């Protein structure tokens, strides 16, 4: 609710400064420009809900882009074949990281950091230069959009991001896997005692994260019409910021995919405002996101302490009643 309120207030402020924000063109542009980030952030939500972190997603985007550029431009593979191939590779990489995290009991931060360096290095081995992607399928997908009331054009990339969010909400709240993610994030030991296979769940969580990061890499390659080994640098931090601003606790167990969507939207809103203003440096986006992160982390800590105090007070009352 806090994230939604921040977004609404921010949008109203932008509207008072620039009436053009009322146009559906602006909203559609925000969706298109942040489609790849929104897709990544959905996967990151599941990871953070489980109490983990995935630092490899930016490198997954880079590898996906250069692999597709090589496969389509140099090896003559059709995008319709290359897309599912790279998706399988991405999911397999995530499953491997998830297995290492659970089997070796090494923090996810370390394993995914290693994955980040590994894939970034492999991307440079494939190509150090930006490789343009020229293919009719890419031309069709990049131009695919639907006109909506107000003159806006909802692109296929923006629509795909919204569909991923809807699917993420369903998985998180209407499936056994979603319940397992929340249970592991709340208390992994208790989840084990309830009969939940933490290894299987962890593997699927990181498979989902890198799978969606690969999908985001496909979207990003369509958006830029190129593959580049430097693509996606810092995107993992933007995704984490979106998830935290969206209300998901970094300690795990609490949060929603819908909140993450508004976290992404807030970042897009700030970027668009800076573009409309024309006098502000793009670095103000990072400054604003940093301030919001400080505020939301402080709120999270405050709510956590309040909850713990209430729990302790309830236990004290029960103990006192029992002793009498």
Label every model-predicted segment.
Residues 1-41, 75-81, 196, 204, ...:
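Membrane-interfacial amphipathic/re-entrant helices at transmembrane-helix boundaries
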Residues 1-8, 12, 193-200, 270-324:
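Cytosolic-side transmembrane-helix boundaries in multi-pass membrane proteins
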Residues 10-75, 99-106, 243-257, 291:
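Single transmembrane alpha-helix segments in multi-pass membrane proteins
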Residues 53, 72-74, 91-134, 171-176, ...:
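Short loop segments and helix-boundary regions at transmembrane helix junctions
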Residues 78-86, 92-97, 101, 149-227:
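Helix-loop-helix "hairpin" substructures at the membrane interface of multi-pass membrane proteins
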Residues 108-174, 201-203, 224-229, 276, ...:
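Transmembrane helix-bundle core of multi-pass membrane transporters
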Residues 213, 223-290:
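Transmembrane alpha-helical segments in multi-pass inner-membrane proteins
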């Amino acid at each position: 609710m806090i994230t939604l309120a921040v977004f609404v207030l921010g949008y109203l402020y932008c509207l008072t400064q620039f009436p053009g924000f009322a146009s559906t063109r602006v909203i559609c542009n925000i969706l298109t420009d942040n489609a790849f980030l929104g897709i990544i952030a959905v996967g990151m939500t599941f990871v953070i809900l489980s109490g983990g972190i995935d630092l490899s997603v930016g490198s997954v985007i880079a590898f996906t882009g250069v692999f597709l550029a090589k496969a389509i431009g140099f090896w003559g593979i059709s995008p319709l074949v290359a897309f599912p191939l790279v998706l399988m590779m991405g999911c397999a990489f995530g499953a491997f990281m998830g297995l290492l995290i659970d089997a070796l009991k090494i923090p996810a931060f370390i394993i995914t950091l290693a994955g980040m360096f590994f894939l970034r290095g492999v991307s440079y081995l494939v190509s150090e230069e930006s490789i343009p992607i020229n293919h009719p399928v890419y031309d069709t997908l990049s131009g695919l959009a639907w006109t909506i009331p107000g003159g806006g054009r909802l692109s296929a990339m923006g629509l795909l991001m919204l569909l991923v969010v809807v699917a993420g909400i369903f998985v998180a709240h209407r499936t056994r896997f979603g319940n397992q993610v929340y249970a592991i994030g709340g208390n992994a030991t208790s989840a084990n005692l309830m009969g939940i296979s933490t290894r299987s769940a962890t593997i699927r969580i990181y498979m989902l994260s890198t799978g969606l990061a690969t999908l985001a890499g496909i979207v990003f390659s369509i958006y830029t019409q190129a593959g580049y080994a430097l693509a996606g640098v810092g995107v993992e931090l933007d995704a984490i910021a979106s998830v935290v601003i969206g209300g998901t606790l970094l300690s795990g167990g609490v949060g929603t995919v819908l909140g993450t969507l508004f976290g992404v939207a807030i970042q897009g809103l700030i970027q668009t405002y800076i573009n409309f203003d024309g006098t502000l440096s793009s670095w103000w986006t990072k400054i604003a996101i940093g301030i919001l992160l400080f505020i939301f982390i402080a709120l999270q800590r405050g709510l956590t302490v309040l909850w713990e105090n209430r729990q302790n007070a309830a236990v004290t009352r029960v103990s006192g009643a029992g002793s009498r």
